[in-house]
Regions:
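Intrinsically disordered, low-complexity, serine/threonine- and charge-rich segments
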Residues: 24-25
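Non-catalytic, conformational "gating/processing" segments within enzyme and secreted inhibitor domains
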Residues: 178-181, 186-208
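Helix-start/capping segments and mature chain N-termini
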Residues: 2-20, 32-33, 38-175, 196, ...
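Short linear motifs centered on serine/threonine within intrinsically disordered regions
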Residues: 28-29
């Protein structure tokens, strides 16, 4: 294989190509990855050949005893990620024998060696998705195959084992079904699912792990922001960078989030709610907090444009982002662009009265309206929620209608 270097492991092959190709090919790895032995390019020259996946049909279940069952908090007291359901899912992997049998067990602390790779080199990834209870009492997942695609891409980039996404979806349906009473009976709330994979090999060598653990925990959640559906204010400071070319900004790795916490605290000390991440000398917009960002412009002559940064390796390919773009293109009422957006363009649009709306998009909050951006000595005011029918609100309502089953849509996947 010219120009690449391959390392063969019993479980998969990872190949490194030139990380800065002149015209990089980007393909989406299917969520059904493990039924083929073909090598597939996934992103930025990284390739993965998966081993045989775990099987949902081999699931073992250990139910909680009555004394292990937890008291469920009132919906009004739910805080994001603080309470957890009665059960969890675990699947172990090692390089010699591959994936083990999936197990659903009572929720418990993890035990691992202090030299585990995850603790020293951040060999880790996670996903975020939700289960929703509709008025018909049916519980649904939202586009779970997209999370599986992204999880497999991140696994390959992290030198962690890939798997058959369809099998994990079946396991997610099963554990949600077992803990279904934890899915809130309220349309402002949902059950948050956190699939996670960590390298557990107990050695300090800087190399691919030969042992790993995939686990899933679940948490009932209310609205992500305590302020409700109200515009937030952002800190945009170009000296802080979240991601860079050739890096892993497009991957769902914990190492992308830990370094942002101190900057988030800086914003909060200034009375702001989130950080608007910029990149490069042009101060290009990338993400807001842990969300994708979208901007609605008035282009004049009755034309409007919904713009969002492109998937160029600096931002996460969000499921909500993809869903909003798909809806907007289906509506066909305004131009939809995936392109670079600079702060100079934002400043100019605001001065000309052409900056209509700015909002974040992500699983936790769906959409989050932005009312102001603090950028240097400027405070850019955005009338996101001041219009008679804000696009932000329309997106929020449209996604919620699908998630809670009020509108029938193939994105909504019943658990049974």
């Amino acid at each position: 294989m010219s120009g690449t270097h391959g390392i063969m492991l019993p479980a998969f092959v990872v190949e490194w190509a030139n990380p800065f190709p002149s015209s990089p090919a980007r393909k989406t790895i299917p969520y059904l990855t493990s039924r083929t032995t073909e090598t597939q390019e996934i992103s930025h020259g990284v390739r993965c050949m998966s081993a045989q996946s775990f099987k949902a049909s081999e699931l073992q279940i250990e139910f909680c005893t009555p004394d292990q069952l937890k008291q469920k908090p009132p919906v009004s007291e739910l805080v994001f990620g603080r309470n957890f359901t009665d059960h969890m899912l675990e699947i172990y992997w090692n390089a010699s024998s591959g994936w083990g049998q999936p197990r659903i067990t009572p929720f418990h602390d993890l035990r691992m060696h202090p030299a585990a790779k995850v603790l020293h080199y951040s060999v880790e990834l996670f996903e975020g998705m939700k289960a929703f209870r509709g008025n018909d009492d049916e519980i649904r997942l939202f586009r779970p195959e997209k999370n599986m695609e992204r999880m497999n891409r991140t696994a390959a980039r992290s030198s962690l084992p890939t798997f058959d996404g369809a099998e994990l979806i079946e396991l997610l349906k099963k554990i949600v079904s077992i803990d279904q009473e934890w899915v809130p009976h309220a349309e402002s709330s949902s059950l948050y699912l956190r699939p996670t994979m960590i390298g557990t090999e107990p050695t300090l060598g800087v190399q691919e792990p030969t042992e790993a653990l995939l686990f899933v925990i679940m948490s009932p959640v209310g609205p992500y922001f305590s302020s409700g559906f109200k515009p937030v204010s952002l800190l945009a400071d170009p000296k802080f960078v979240r991601a860079w070319p050739g890096g892993c900004g497009m991957m769902k790795m914990g190492s992308n989030y830990g370094p942002t916490l101190a900057i988030q605290k800086t914003a909060e000390r200034q009375g702001l709610q989130q950080v608007l991440w910029l990149f490069g000398p042009e101060h290009r917009i990338t993400e807001v907090g842990a969300m994708n960002l979208m901007v609605f412009f008035d282009k004049g002559n009755g034309e409007k444009e919904l713009a969002t940064p492109p998937l160029d390796g600096l931002i996460l390919p969000g499921v909500t982002r993809d869903s909003l773009l798909s809806l907007a293109r289906e509506w066909n009422e305004f131009t939809v662009s995936e392109r670079d957006i600079t702060m100079a363009e934002i400043v100019q649009a605001e001065s000309e009265g052409k900056l209509l709306e700015v909002f974040g998009a992500g699983t936790a909050a769906v959409v989050t309206p932005v009312g102001a951006i603090h950028y240097g000595d400027k405070i850019i005011k955005i009338p996101t929620m001041e219009h008679e029918k804000p696009l932000t609100q329309r997106f929020f309502d449209s996604i919620k209608d699908i998630q809670y089953g009020r509108v029938k849509h193939p994105w909504s996947v019943p658990i049974e």
